[in-house]
UniProtKB/Swiss-Prot annotation:
Belongs to the UDP-glycosyltransferase family. It comes from Arabidopsis thaliana. PANTHER family: GLUCOSYL/GLUCURONOSYL TRANSFERASES, UDP-GLYCOSYLTRANSFERASE 76E1-RELATED. Possesses low quercetin 3-O-glucosyltransferase and 7-O-glucosyltransferase activities in vitro. This is UDP-glycosyltransferase 76E2. The gene is UGT76E2. CDD domains: GT1_Gtf-like.
Length: 449
């Protein structure tokens, strides 16, 4: 493919309007733009990303009358996904029709849509455009959804309600247990299985792109390739392949100055993502556990993440006094810069896939406290497969928090985990270099266009 030809070819991206989905999609856009493609991003709302100078070369379209990220918080994931796909199909067709008219009908190489934006398929089929599904989760989570989409809902529900079943390994998904399966994100199990049957149905898509790497998930990727019968391109981690600042929240960079004053590998960084909610009791147990550990910490407390509180007003004055010299709390942090900072020795995370691969990519071991969905899958793999994480299960108490932080930052076991994390980081770096598996996979995808 000659450079001139590629420069005239456009790829359309359709992300879910949520931080964990927008970020990797914009990184994918950067990677494809670096290969010479023009990029159009179709958003359900105008936001900080569309106005960012980092994407000044991108073209942005907005689907009229759609849903926003605030609707996701108000409706919940299940109703949000179903409603989004119901109301966006017709208006998205209009967007694509308008774009084709502007581009003389022959400019669009393909439409890459987030697996949860499956309404996109109807439009690309009508206009006979190639389509590509983009999965923002791990390959293992995709496999899980595929398996769950085929189970008998009634018998599966009986198994999931049996306490004795929870710790058993689910057949064919070792080492995942029943309680690790991504079943809770979309409310009732029946609703979850319905959504999963839509997301794993690649319909007439010509390929699937996964934000992962062969060195992380070779067996799951091979299983997907066999099952889907279309090319699967693991081209991640995209935050390394093509860094693209795309935070929907304002970052407080003062925390970097604070980190500059801390000792190497001494700080535990805590961030539970852009959507997770935590009750006041758990927040207080975390706070006192962090205080009692006597270790420095950088804690992201997102406004509105504690129901009934605007921000940190539920933290006792005594706690604030005790940790004033070694604790730093912000509303949102520049996570990649924090994770690569030499002062950071561990990451307490909800284990969303973006946070997981970002931590792996910087060689930072993790404390895993998943809330829902694929976070539980990732946490299990961090602890049992990659062995660079320790999972906190059950009720949270300050003693458990204190032990986990000390174990990761002070004890010999934590040092061994850090060595394994650095080894995995080196494998990741090799995969994204020229000739590496992820780099080659991206080239293969580009050549297929």
């Amino acid at each position: 493919m000659e450079e001139k030809q590629v420069k005239e070819t456009r790829i359309v991206l359709v992300p879910v309007p949520a931080q964990g989905h927008v970020t990797p999609m914009m990184q994918l856009g950067k990677a494809l733009h670096s290969k010479g493609f023009s990029i159009t991003v179709v958003l359900t709302q105008s936001n900080r990303v569309s106005s960012s100078k980092d994407f000044s070369d991108f073209h942005f379209l907005t689907i009229p009358g759609s849903l926003t990220e605030s609707d996701l918080q108000n409706l919940g994931p299940q109703k949000f996904v179903l409603k989004l796909n119901q109301i966006c199909e017709a208006s998205f067709k209009q967007c694509i029709g308008q774009l084709l008219h502007e581009q003389c009908n022959n400019d669009i190489a393909c439409v890459v849509y987030d697996e949860y934006m499956y309404f996109s398929h109807a439009a690309v089929k009508e206009f006979q455009l190639p389509s590509v599904v983009f999965s923002t989760t791990s390959a293992t989570a995709f496999v899980c959804r595929s398996v769950l989409s085929r189970v008998n809902a009634e018998s599966f529900l009986i198994d999931m309600k049996d306490p004795e079943t929870q710790d058993k390994v689910f057949p064919g998904l070792h080492p995942l247990r029943y309680k690790d399966l991504p079943t809770s994100v979309f409310g009732p199990i029946e609703s979850t299985l319905k959504v999963y049957s839509e997301t794993v149905n690649t319909r007439t898509a010509s390929a699937v792109i996964i934000n992962s790497a062969s060195c992380l998930e070779s067996s799951s990727l091979a299983r997907l390739q066999q099952q889907l019968q279309v090319p699967v391109y693991p081209i991640g981690p995209l935050h390394i392949t093509a860094s693209a600042p795309s935070s929907l929240l304002e970052e407080d960079r003062s925390c970097v100055e604070w980190l500059n004053k801390q000792k190497s590998n001494s700080v535990i960084y805590i961030s539970l993502g852009s959507l997770a909610l935590m009750d006041t009791k758990d927040m207080l147990e975390m706070a006192w556990g962090l205080s009692n550990s006597n270790q420095p910490f950088l804690w992201v407390v997102r406004p509105g993440s504690i129901p009934g509180s605007e921000w940190t007003e539920s933290l006792p004055e005594e706690f604030n006094r005790l940790v004033s010299e070694r604790g730093y709390i912000v509303k949102w942090a520049p996570q990649m810069e924090v994770l690569r900072h030499p002062a950071v020795g561990g990451f307490w995370s909800h284990c969303g896939w973006n946070s997981t691969v970002e931590s792996i990519g910087e060689g930072v071991p993790m404390i895993c406290r998943p809330f829902t969905g694929d976070q539980k899958v990732n946490a299990r793999y961090l602890e049992r497969v990659w062995r660079i994480g320790v999972q906190l299960e059950g009720d949270l108490d300050k003693e458990t928090v204190e032990r986990a932080v000390e174990w990761l930052l002070v004890d010999e076991e934590g040092a061994e985990m850090r060595k394994r994390a650095i080894d995995l980081k080196e494998k990741i770096e090799t995969s994204v270099r020229s000739g590496g598996s992820s780099c080659s996979s991206l080239d293969d995808f580009v050549n297929s266009m």
